[in-house]
Design a protein with these regions (language model features):
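Extended recognition/assembly regions associated with phosphoester-bond processing machinery
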Residues: 1-129
Length: 129
């Protein structure tokens, strides 16, 4: 829109800044564990006009977000004893436009833990719920 520029480069920059802020908080408070609750990570198929405005299709969004999120978790795992990751099924990640027509589980957010468990399986202090 005219007030805000957002693309995958901006997303990467924002996630990197957010990660640095979390690390600063960890250092300040000597936090041992990090808890991440994630939802609404992509713009699904709920509004056709929004879908057409997105510069990445649904699958590219998921791949981009999954890689960036995994990198964030990898970075945080170096500073915390444990990193616990929870994902919550959101409304915007639906794969069906009409909420009434959507079946339980038809949501891209549900795929994220599956991907993260495979990607981060060798990180003993990362726990994907």
């Amino acid at each position: 829109n005219f007030k805000n520029h957002f693309d995958e480069n901006e997303l990467k920059k924002r996630i990197e800044n957010y990660t640095l802020k979390i690390i600063q908080i960890q250092k300040l408070h000597q936090a041992e564990n990090c808890y991440i609750v994630a939802s609404e990570l992509i713009s699904g198929l709920i509004h056709n006009n929004l879908r057409l405005q997105n510069n990445l299709d649904l699958m590219e969004q998921f791949k981009t977000v999954s890689l960036l999120f995994a990198t964030m978790i990898q970075d945080l795992s170096q500073y915390f004893n444990n990193v616990y990751v929870y994902t919550v099924e959101g409304n915007h990640s639906r794969v069906v436009a009409k909420k009434e027509d959507s079946l339980q589980g038809e949501n891209m957010d549900i795929l994220l833990p599956f991907y993260l468990q495979a990607k981060l399986q060798n990180y003993q202090n990362v726990h994907i719920q």
